[in-house]
Amino acid sequence: MDNENPAHAGWRLARENPKLVLLEVAWRWSFGILALLLLGWAVASVLHRVTISDADWVALRSLDLHDTPYTLAKIIILFWQDLLLVFATLLSALALAWMITATWGRAATLRILEGRSNTPAVAGLNLLRVLLFIVTLLAAVFAVEGAVWLSTPSAADPAELNWALYLLIVLIALPLIMIAWGILNWVLSLAPLFAVREQKGAFASLAAAFRSLRCNRKVYWSVSGVYGLYRGAALVALTVMGLLLAVLSQSKIVLGLLLALLLLYFAFADLLYVARLAAYLQIVEGQLPALQLPAAS
């Protein structure tokens, strides 16, 4: 297996270690269940704090292109303080839940692959991912608000918004922000491999991840492309089967089948994630000596 490429090696390791997949499913689905419970709490809290009239309920349920957005905007404007408090609490709780489950899950999977772990460094890297998400969210909000400000000729009359300029700014700024977030988040997800192998802290592991990407970017992109293609094909298959089932019938049985297909897709996506992680580990193991910084003389 010396000539085995990283993508094939990762797939083989995932198949030979079903416990890896079970651990990945366990932590991701645990977070998913916690997220649903927290979302349910947020909805209940909003309904308790916000008074919605019968007419507003009718407008919200109608899904009318004019009445529904108008009613929703009116509710947000009237109760923005309560909604902001609930949103901030929900976001904080989700971040904490994700940090705990993700740190436990990644430390456990790497312990199987490497025989050891580095939980403090993994937790630090996950904290950086949470902070990156918050910064990205704020950047998106500022981009939208900045687009409104730049597209309004007169501050006294916001109705004079230049929609063409507004859309141009938003459609350029938001994709750039998302691309930057995607790249940095991916590097942060790669860094735990170096935290475990080199037993270093979060920032040293992050620096090692950047060095590895600089030396082996083609191999990393190749592995990511292979598993991205698999996941894309699975998503297309899920969409096609879901549409076919929806066209054939709208019974509860079909709804149950759709839910089962969705869960199957999530499980397959977790399998692919573990295989990709193992493939990245093969790259790291093959290049580790070249990544060490020279000792200071």
Where are these regions (language model features)?
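Hydrophobic alpha-helical transmembrane segments of membrane proteins
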Residues: A93-W104, A108, D270, V274
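Alpha-helical membrane-spanning segments of integral membrane proteins, especially the hydrophobic core
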Residues: F79-A95, G115-V141, N162-I177
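Juxtamembrane transition segments at transmembrane-helix termini in multipass membrane proteins
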Residues: D2-A9, R15, K19, L23-L78, ...
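Non-cytosolic segments of integral membrane proteins
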Residues: A139-E160
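Residue-identity detector for threonine
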Residues: T51, T68-T71, T89, T101-T103, ...
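Cytosolic-side membrane-entry/anchor segment at the start of a transmembrane helix
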Residues: L13, N17-W29, L34-W41, E114-V144
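Hydrophobic alpha-helical transmembrane segments of integral membrane proteins
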Residues: T101-T103, A107-F142, R211-Y230
